Amino acid sequence: MQMFCYQCSQAANGTGCTEYGVCGKSPTVARLQDNLVFAIKGISAYYYHARELGYDDPEIAGFLDEALYSTLTNVNFDAQSFVEYALEAGRMNLRAMQLLKKAHIETYGEPTPVEVETGTKKGKGIIVTGHNLKALEELLKQVEGTNVYVYTHSEMLPAHGYPGLRKYKNLVGNLGKAWYDQRKLFTEYPVAILGTSNCVLIPSESYRDRMFTTSIARLPGVKHIDGYDYTEVIEKAKSLPDLEEKPGSYKLRTGFSTSVVVSLADKIKELVEAGKIKHFLVVGGCDVPFKRNEYYREFVQKLPKETVVITLACGKFRINDLDLGDIEGIPRLIDVGQCNDTIVAIEIAQALAKVFGVEVTDLPLTLVLTWMEQKAVAILWTLLALGLKNIYVGPVLPAWVNEDILKVLTAEFGLKTISEPEKDIKEILKV
């Protein structure tokens, strides 16, 4: 099947065009339109969360209108223009991430490094999953002074880095890892669960009656909370058995904001010039429950000790329990936050380039990314729009990429797919 399009009444056989569009749309144009729609979805997620906090950008809204309109039937048949739209989507996603970062910092303060407990505290519990810091804050306000303790899950882990959230004493730790462990995790712990955004799964019957959604998230058979009154969530938590006091087997470090890392720039420069840091790698992204994604942990474990790894998004959970140590006080594993905090990794790279007096593309920097869904598509186009090279992606290429699109991505943008950890390390470090 070369393409699939069934958005108009002319769809072949009444089911969909699979070889060529009845309208004249080529398979490559159809796939590039799909790519653009996916990127728009990713931008919309970040833009939505920024607007929840009262931050807006009409330029982003204008782009979303135009770009989505361009995919309507009989509007645009030009493949090159859709490549340009994709790059513009990358630039707009950059604006959206900048806007959301601004919203988060002005609302909750700039993150600072913190160690997060992975065990449980004696008392009642609520697990918060998703990405929505506003929902978490409102819940924390409402459980103050009670024995109902709040635990983050997956992409909510970076919340602990924000001073304005960390100040709440009922925010006590993080349970679980990436989004796909939730059915097992939520069954294991007798707690109330609040799903705040994407990355929620249809629940099993073992916990459906103690799960709630809020904001954009909704699940069949699960009570949805409109607004931010979480009384029902808290009462459900109170009705459940206490969690026992149980220390975690390790702690997780997060909260490395742009300012924190940039404050170390002179020391980093000194270590690079002394040959004690030889390469920086961004290893992270959206994780998936594939055996293939064991690659990322093995990759980091096999890196030489003269490397520094920046991680982000739920892909961090493949590696963030590893003790990589430090290089004269510079941590070898730096967690900069959620997937939208790709902007932090970008700003760090730009700051280091300025310190060394070079372009970002001249830094000893490689990106090794895992992708899962549409937000990752938007982020990839952001990186490509910035002209970044040395990007490895896995576990698989997006299904919308055909040979023509792959040629553009590899020839013009230098995109590569992951192979085997040792092979890729040798290629990256040229050893």
Curated annotation (Swiss-Prot):
Pfam families named among the record's database cross-references: Prismane
Catalytic activity from the UniProt record: A + NH4(+) + H2O = hydroxylamine + AH2 + H(+)
Q: What is this protein called?
A: Hydroxylamine reductase
UniProt lineage? Bacteria, Thermotogati, Thermotogota, Thermotogae, Thermotogales
State the InterPro entries in the record: HCP/CODH, Hydroxylam_reduct, Prismane-like_a/b-sand, Prismane-like_sf, Prismane_a-bundle
Q: Where in the cell is it found?
A: Cytoplasm
The answer on whether this UniProt entry bears the keyword Transferase reads no
Q: Which residues form the signal peptide?
A: none
Gene Ontology MF terms in the entry: 4 iron, 4 sulfur cluster binding; hydroxylamine reductase activity; metal ion binding; peroxidase activity
Note on cofactor: Binds 1 [4Fe-4S] cluster.
Q: Which major enzyme category is it?
A: oxidoreductase
Instruction: Give the UniProt family note.
Output: Belongs to the HCP family.
